[in-house]
Amino acid sequence: MDSRDEDRQAAPDYQAEHELRRANDEWANALAQRDKAALECIMADDFTFAYPFEGDDKGQFINDVVAGVVRVESLEPRDTTVRVFGGTGLVFGSETANWHYGDRDLSGHYRFVRVYTKRQGLWQIVSLHLCSPTHR
């Protein structure tokens, strides 16, 4: 492989990055609107939570959102970074979230990592991890 091939492989995929940013916005909107159809499309069937809903699968999470057990009023991302590795994308950064789980207010500042994969032309979330940053 010559250096021109390496340059082409290392070049950012701006189209995929744009698509992932849009998918990430659609995720936030679907949560806030409790849009079952959109969540079913955005979330992969083999979706898993790393935290805070570990153990919930796609169906359980969507049911909780639609029923109002999980209520997301807003997600305001900051410092979002997108990385693309072929058909896999990582979206990570921080966000201020206004949300509730049952009667608990879990609003605050979070760090997040969302893993997407492109399937049949659509980016779908396959894994999600949230954590509260430790303050020093």
Where are the predicted features?
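A beta-strand edge to alpha-helix "cap/lid" segment located at domain peripheries
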Residues: 2-41, 46-136
